[in-house]
């Protein structure tokens, strides 16, 4: 039969072909085995000759239910996108690694209150949360679906000293009221950061307590953020990272002095976790890991941020913006080549940064072995055995006294 003149003739476009491939993948994926355990990769030797605090940190974008749709992830069976199933799988993943500090991104407001917080409290955690800025303007029903950032900590090892919400939208107005590019590009994004100042407890120390009682309660500033997603706006992500480091520096300065003890700036520990939506060759990574970024960086090309950045720096002009936090990334691509793994995109965009002068990274978990993806034709995540489109980053650290 000749279909050349048939009005019902179907012309398959790229999206149609992708759906066909996804359907074929699902048919072939009826029988699967879970991935093997992720390998532990030591990065520094353990110091055992003096009192130390050893703790683990997880950073994990859990994928908001609002984004986990069959249209977006057609290669994942629908039942495994359902929150009732996926949420339990995410919690199993969190419990499996049993981290002492947990930073989660894309946590919905209602899910924090009714799912994440009660489940983690049952495992002796406490936590705080901040939704994206748009939640303030929405009805209660819609507000519950807004995602944000959460920080949890084990109460036997840490106590909360203070916390702070960082709203990039608000800071864009403060820093760039006379900058059209700041208002048009940064102000319109509602990403947030969350800061928590944690104090180590006596139970957190091994090999005996510190000789100096003042060393028992060491301060760690934990920052968690989720930067703007769109690759067309690298300048926005870089500005957001600059705003966040400025707020962290301000927090360091505010906790340095106490009635009992004056601390040096370098004695305050910093952990910066999150989904930065930025590759390692980005301005975000360069700025955070090296402590500086020239204003001539290509990501600023064509945009006049000069006045806004001068305001961010306290009114002093320089040809570069800097921060004094001395941060290092716990993970590198040689260890963890990707933290986001979807059909169209696979790369490292999540990071755990830490103070490199006073905190030693002992090791990190590597990736799910590529052989597993290849063996079962796994096109991307989420997946029946991988509940998010991101993998959790997990690192261990040691403080000494």
Task: Give the predicted meaning of each segment.
Residues 1-148, 241-242, 246, 250, ...:
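N-terminal, active-site-proximal structural segment of metallo-dependent hydrolase catalytic domains
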């Amino acid at each position: 039969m000749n279909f050349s003149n048939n009005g019902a003739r179907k012309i398959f476009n790229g999206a149609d072909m992708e759906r066909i491939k996804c359907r074929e993948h699902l048919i072939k994926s009826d029988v699967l085995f879970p991935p093997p355990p992720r390998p532990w990769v030591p990065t520094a030797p353990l110091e055992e000759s003096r009192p130390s605090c050893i703790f683990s940190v997880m950073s994990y974008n859990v994928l908001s239910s609002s984004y986990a749709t069959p249209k977006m992830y057609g290669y994942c069976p629908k039942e495994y996108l359902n929150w009732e199933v996926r949420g339990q799988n995410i919690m199993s993943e969190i419990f499996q690694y049993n981290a002492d500090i947990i930073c989660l991104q894309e946590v919905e407001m209602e899910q924090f209150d009714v799912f994440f917080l009660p489940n983690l409290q049952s495992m002796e955690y406490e936590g705080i949360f901040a939704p994206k800025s748009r939640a303030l303007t929405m009805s209660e029903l819609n507000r519950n679906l807004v995602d944000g950032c959460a920080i949890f900590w084990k109460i036997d090892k840490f106590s909360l000293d203070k916390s702070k919400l960082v709203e990039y939208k608000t800071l864009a107005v403060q820093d760039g009221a006379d900058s059209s590019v700041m208002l048009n590009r940064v102000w319109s994004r509602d990403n947030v950061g969350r800061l928590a100042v944690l104090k180590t407890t006596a139970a957190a120390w091994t090999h005996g307590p510190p000789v100096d009682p003042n060393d028992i309660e060491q301060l760690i500033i934990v920052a968690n953020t989720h930067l703007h997603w769109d690759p067309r706006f690298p300048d926005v992500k870089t500005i957001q990272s600059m705003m966040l480091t400025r707020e962290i520096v301000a927090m360091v300065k505010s906790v340095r002095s106490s009635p009992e003890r004056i601390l040096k700036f370098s004695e305050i520990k910093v952990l910066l976790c999150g989904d930065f939506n930025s590759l390692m060759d980005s301005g975000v990574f360069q700025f955070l890991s090296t402590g500086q970024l020239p204003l001539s960086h290509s990501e600023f090309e064509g945009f006049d941020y000069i006045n806004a950045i001068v305001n961010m720096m306290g009114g002093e002009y320089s040809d570069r913006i800097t921060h004094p936090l001395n941060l290092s990334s716990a993970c590198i691509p040689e260890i963890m080549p990707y933290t986001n793994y979807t059909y169209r995109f696979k790369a490292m965009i999540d990071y755990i940064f830490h103070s490199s002068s006073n905190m030693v990274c002992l090791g990190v978990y590597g990736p799910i072995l590529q052989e597993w993806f290849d063996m079962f034709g796994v096109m991307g995540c989420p997946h029946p055995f991988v509940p998010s489109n991101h993998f959790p980053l997990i690192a261990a650290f040691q403080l000494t006294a």
